[in-house]
Amino acid sequence: RITSVLRLLETEEGRDRTETIRRKLALLRDIRSTIERTGGNCVFDDIELFELKFFALLAEELRPLASQGRLAELPELNGVVDLLDPEGNRLPHFFVYGAYSEELTTLRKQIKARKQAGADESQVQELYFRSVEIEDCIRERLSVELRKYHKALQQALDLMGWLDVVIAKAMQARDWGLTRPAITQDTASFR
């Protein structure tokens, strides 16, 4: 694969594609433990759900770039993105969106209206606690649904890490003028 990257680096378009991939890979964080947890029976918090959404968005941006350059075939993670981004904004943040539950949307509107009306704090607090319960149920449901993407997430993380190393090696070989050794029958030559 290093030779594939070296061939890409020979053209301006290939260099641009490789540089774009490198910039995107620089955003990659080590979320191995979070991805491992998708294989278990745990409930993710908002930070872990954000990590998974950000990772899936990044993988989806990289997938066509890596495929066009014939570097790697990343698994499709649109299902993860759709699950964690029900409004389809494709922004790298996570929030328990109102789109997950009409009841949650209604409660949030009631809380806001009562606060603006100067309602008794205990009434607002009761609504707030109910909204937190609904959010927790949504997090639990999302965590269960994410289990089916465990292998794809793991494969994408492994391939993205591998791709980062291969590109770095190819760029080092190019920058240092390294050549691939070849075994010959006749003579040996050194450059």
Model regions and ranges:
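Extended, charged alpha-helical coiled-coil/arm scaffolds that mediate oligomerization and mechanical coupling
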Residues: E76-D164
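Generic preference for flexible, low-structure residues
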Residues: I47, L65-Q68, R147, K169, ...
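Charged, alpha-helix-enriched surfaces in structured cytosolic catalytic cores
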Residues: E19-A26, I47-F50, F54-L57, A99, ...
